[in-house]
C-alpha cells in the first residue's frame, strides 16, 4: 500500500460527499474515484469535489487497481452485496452504518473480510472521535462511581414520503436502522467500559414502537436493555419525531451528560462532557479538543490501522459490529418490524448470486457417507436446527453450510414449539433444494413418547417442514414402558407410506436398540438405519437434558463398531468444552461445569491443545476430528451460531488422526 491511502467511494449521495470532504482534510488519504449507478451522477460528484475518475457502475470502480480502500455509501439493503464484492476485490473497506440489514448480513460481510484479508470497519464516526475515548476513560476511572443506568437517544422528524429512503420499506427505512443504531452502540460501549471490556452485549432486550401504517417503517421506538453487572439502559430513536439527542450515564456518585454525542466536532470545533457529582451544585466541564473534522478523523483511523485489519476500541471492531447488529435485530423483533425483503420467501443470498454447492477444493472440503434408505450421500457434518429462527439470519447460515457441501439438517418437533421446523421448511422451499438436502426429523419426546402421538407429531412436522417426507425420522426419546414392537410397527407404517425414508432412535439404551432391530427382523419390518446419542472427546458426566444418553461406553461403542451402524452424535464438540476459555477455575458457565468439568476431561483438553499446536489447527478441530475418526460411520451434529463457527467446524474434516493419536487423546496410552 502506498503512503497515501487511495480511496474510492461507492454511492454518490449526501453522506458520500460529507466523507469525501473529510478525506480531503486528512494527511494520509485521498479520494481518487467515485462510483455511481449512473455516469451522470458520478460526473456531477466528481465535478463538485474534484475527483478525476468517475465510474458509471460500482463494478468499474472495484476494477480500478489503484483504489486501495472503498467507502460504501449505498442504501442499507445494498451494503452486504457491495461490501462482499469489495472484499473479494481485495480492497479495504469502510462500510456506512448499519453494516447490513441484520445480523446475518453482518456475519457474511465480516467473514468476507476475514477470507480476503482486508480491513473492515463499520462507519460509526463518533466512535473515532476523542470525545468518545474520553467518555470511556471517565467511566473506567469511575468518575461517577459504578454505572447503573444509561440513557441514549437519537431521533429527528422527517415528513412522510413512502419513496424516501427514511420511510421506504424496501430501503430499510425507519429509525432503528437509520439512527437507532447509534444509541445502541453507545450503551453497549459504556456497559463494556463499566465492566472492564471493550463492549458488552445485553442479556435481554425489550422494546416498543410505532410502525407507520403504510410502509411499516418504525416511526419512533424505545428499548430497554439489561447488561451484566446490574447495568440497565434505555435507548430511543425516531424518524417522525424530534427528540433530545443526548447521552446520560448515571452512577452511584453522580451522572455524566454528553450534549453532542453523535456529531462531536463535526467541523473541527472542540466539544465537552459534563460531570454532575453528588452534592456538588455545579457540573465539572471536561473540554475535549478536536484535532480535525469528524469524518477526517474516521478516515485517518482506517488508514492508521490497515495492517491490523481492524481498528481498536472505541472504534467498531468486528465483534462489536456483530453484537450491535444482533441487538438491533432483537429490538426490531420486539416491535414486530420485519422488512418485506426479510420474509422467508424473499430473502436473497447475501452475495446475490444463485445458491450453489461450491466445487470441491478449499471452499468445499465436505465429506459424505451413506445411510441405508437415504438417497443423497449424507454430509459428515449435520447442521443442528434448534435455536435461531429469524429468516435472514438462518438463510445466511444455512446458505453458507450448503455452499460448503453440507446437506443434512437436524431438527425436532419440540424445538421452539415448531418454529425451528417452520424456519427450515421455509428456507428449503424458498431455495428449491428439497431433493438436494437430507432432513433428520425427530418426534416422540417425553412425555408424548407413545405410538399414538408419534403419528400426529410426524404429520404436523411434515406440514411445518413443507415436505411430503422425512429422509430420516428418529424417536427423540424412549419409553421403556411401551413394548418395542409397538414402536417398530408405527414407524414402519410411515416407512410403507413413504413419509419416512429411513428410521432411527435417539437416546435409547443398547438393549432397547437391539430389541428394536431383533423384533423388526423377526417380523419382516424395517430396522434402524442410524441412532443419535451423545459422543465427544470429552466424556459427558451429567446429561444436559433429562433422558439423554451417551454412546461413550464400551458396550455401545463395541456394538457400533461390530454392526457399523451409523451414529449421529449430538454435542459432538463437547458444547464448548474445547474453547480457549475453558479451565478448571472458570465456573462462569454452570452447565458446562455440571456436564463436563472433571479431571480426566481436563487432561483430554490439554492433549487436544497440544496436538492442535502440532497440527496448526484449533483444539475444537481436534475434538471434532476425534468423533469423525471412530471405527464406525459418524455424522456429527454441530450447532454453529455464526458463519465463522461453521468455517471452524469444517477445518476438522481435514484433520487426520492416527490410531495412536486417537488412543492418546482418549487417555488410553
Task: Give the residues covered by each predicted segment.
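Beta-loop-alpha module in the N-terminal Rossmann-like domain of NAD(P)-dependent dehydrogenases
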Residues: 49-112
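Rossmann-like dinucleotide-binding domain that binds NAD(P)(H)
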Residues: 162-232, 236-243, 319, 323
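A contiguous active-site-proximal alpha/beta segment in oxidoreductase catalytic domains
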Residues: 100-160
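NAD(P)-dinucleotide binding in Rossmann-like oxidoreductases
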Residues: 213-218, 228-300, 306, 310-319
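C-terminal helix-rich "cap/oligomerization" subdomain common to oxidoreductases
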Residues: 1, 69-71, 304-365
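N-terminal Rossmann-like dinucleotide-binding module
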Residues: 1-49
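Beta/alpha (TIM)-barrel catalytic core signal, keyed to glycine-rich beta->alpha loops juxtaposed to Asp/Glu
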Residues: 223, 392, 478, 482-669
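N-terminal binding-site loop/beta-alpha segment at the start of enzyme catalytic domains
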Residues: 346-437, 496
Amino acid at each position: 500500500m502506498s503512503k497515501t491511502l487511495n480511496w474510492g467511494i461507492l454511492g454518490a449521495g449526501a453522506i458520500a460527499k460529507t466523507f469525501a470532504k473529510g478525506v480531503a482534510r486528512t494527511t494520509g488519504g485521498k479520494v481518487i474515484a467515485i462510483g455511481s449507478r449512473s455516469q451522470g451522477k458520478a460526473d456531477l460528484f466528481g465535478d463538485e469535489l474534484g475527483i478525476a475518475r468517475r465510474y458509471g457502475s460500482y463494478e468499474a470502480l472495484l476494477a480500478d487497481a489503484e483504489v486501495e480502500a472503498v467507502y460504501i455509501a449505498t442504501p442499507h439493503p445494498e451494503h452486504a452485496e457491495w461490501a462482499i464484492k469489495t472484499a473479494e476485490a481485495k480492497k479495504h473497506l469502510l462500510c456506512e452504518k448499519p453494516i447490513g440489514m441484520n445480523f446475518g448480513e453482518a456475519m457474511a460481510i465480516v467473514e468476507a473480510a476475514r477470507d480476503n484479508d482486508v480491513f473492515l470497519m463499520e462507519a460509526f464516526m463518533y466512535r473515532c472521535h476523542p470525545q468518545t475515548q474520553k467518555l470511556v476513560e471517565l467511566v473506567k476511572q469511575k468518575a461517577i462511581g459504578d454505572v447503573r443506568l444509561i440513557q441514549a437517544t437519537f431521533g429527528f422528524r422527517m415528513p412522510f414520503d413512502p419513496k424516501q429512503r427514511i420511510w421506504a420499506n424496501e430501503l430499510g427505512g425507519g429509525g432503528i436502522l437509520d439512527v437507532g443504531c447509534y444509541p445502541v452502540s453507545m450503551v453497549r460501549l459504556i456497559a463494556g467500559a463499566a465492566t472492564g471490556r471493550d463492549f458488552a452485549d445485553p442479556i435481554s432486550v425489550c422494546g416498543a414502537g410505532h410502525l407507520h401504517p403504510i410502509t411499516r417503517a418504525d416511526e419512533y421506538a424505545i428499548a430497554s436493555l439489561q447488561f451484566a453487572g446490574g447495568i440497565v439502559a434505555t435507548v430511543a430513536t425516531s424518524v417522525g419525531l424530534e427528540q433530545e439527542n443526548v447521552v446520560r450515564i448515571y452512577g452511584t456518585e453522580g451522572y455524566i451528560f454528553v450534549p453532542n454525542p453523535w456529531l462531536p466536532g463535526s467541523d473541527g470545533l472542540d466539544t465537552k462532557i459534563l460531570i454532575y457529582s453528588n452534592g456538588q451544585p455545579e457540573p465539572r466541564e471536561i473540554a475535549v479538543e478536536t484535532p480535525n473534522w469528524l469524518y477526517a478523523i474516521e478516515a485517518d483511523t482506517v488508514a492508521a490501522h490497515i495492517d491490523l485489519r481492524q481498528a481498536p476500541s472505541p472504534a467498531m471492531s468486528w465483534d462489536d459490529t456483530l453484537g450491535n447488529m444482533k441487538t438491533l435485530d432483537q429490538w426490531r423483533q420486539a416491535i414486530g418490524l420485519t422488512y418485506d425483503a426479510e420474509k422467508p420467501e424473499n430473502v436473497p443470498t447475501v452475495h446475490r448470486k444463485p445458491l450453489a454447492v461450491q466445487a470441491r477444493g478449499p471452499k468445499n472440503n465436505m465429506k459424505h457417507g451413506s445411510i441405508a434408505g437415504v438417497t443423497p450421500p449424507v454430509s459428515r457434518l449435520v447442521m443442528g436446527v434448534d435455536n435461531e429462527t429469524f429468516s435472514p439470519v438462518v438463510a445466511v447460515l444455512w446458505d453458507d453450510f450448503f455452499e460448503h457441501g453440507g446437506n443434512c439438517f437436524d431438527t425436532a418437533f419440540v424445538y421452539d414449539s415448531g418454529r425451528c421446523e417452520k424456519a427450515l421448511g421455509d428456507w428449503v422451499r424458498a431455495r428449491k433444494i428439497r431433493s438436494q438436502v437430507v432432513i433428520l426429523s425427530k418426534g416422540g419426546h417425553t412425555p408424548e413418547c407413545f405410538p399414538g402421538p408419534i403419528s400426529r407429531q410426524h404429520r404436523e412436522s411434515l406440514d411445518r417442514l413443507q415436505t411430503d417426507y422425512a429422509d430420516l425420522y428418529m424417536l427423540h426419546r424412549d419409553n421403556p414402558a411401551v413394548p418395542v414392537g409397538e414402536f417398530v410397527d408405527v414407524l414402519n407404517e410411515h416407512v410403507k407410506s413413504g413419509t419416512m425414508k429411513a428410521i432411527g432412535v435417539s437416546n435409547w439404551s443398547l438393549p432397547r436398540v437391539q430389541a428394536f432391530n431383533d423384533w423388526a427382523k423377526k417380523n419382516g419390518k424395517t430396522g434402524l438405519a442410524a441412532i443419535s446419542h451423545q459422543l465427544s472427546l470429552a466424556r459427558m458426566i451429567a446429561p444436559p437434558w433429562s433422558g439423554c444418553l451417551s454412546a461413550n461406553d464400551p458396550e455401545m461403542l463395541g456394538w457400533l463398531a461390530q454392526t457399523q451402524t451409523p451414529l449421529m452424535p449430538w454435542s459432538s464438540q463437547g458444547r464448548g468444552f474445547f474453547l480457549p476459555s475453558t479451565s478448571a477455575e472458570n465456573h462462569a458457565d454452570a452447565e458446562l461445569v455440571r456436564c463436563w468439568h472433571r479431571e480426566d476431561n481436563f487432561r483430554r483438553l490439554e492433549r487436544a491443545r497440544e496436538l492442535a499446536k502440532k497440527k496448526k489447527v484449533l483444539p475444537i478441530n481436534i475434538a471434532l476430528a476425534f468423533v469423525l475418526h471412530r471405527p464406525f460411520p459418524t455424522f456429527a451434529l454441530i450447532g454453529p451460531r455464526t458463519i465463522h463457527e461453521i468455517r471452524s467446524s469444517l477445518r476438522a474434516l481435514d484433520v487426520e488422526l492416527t490410531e495412536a493419536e486417537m488412543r492418546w487423546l482418549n487417555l488410553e496410552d
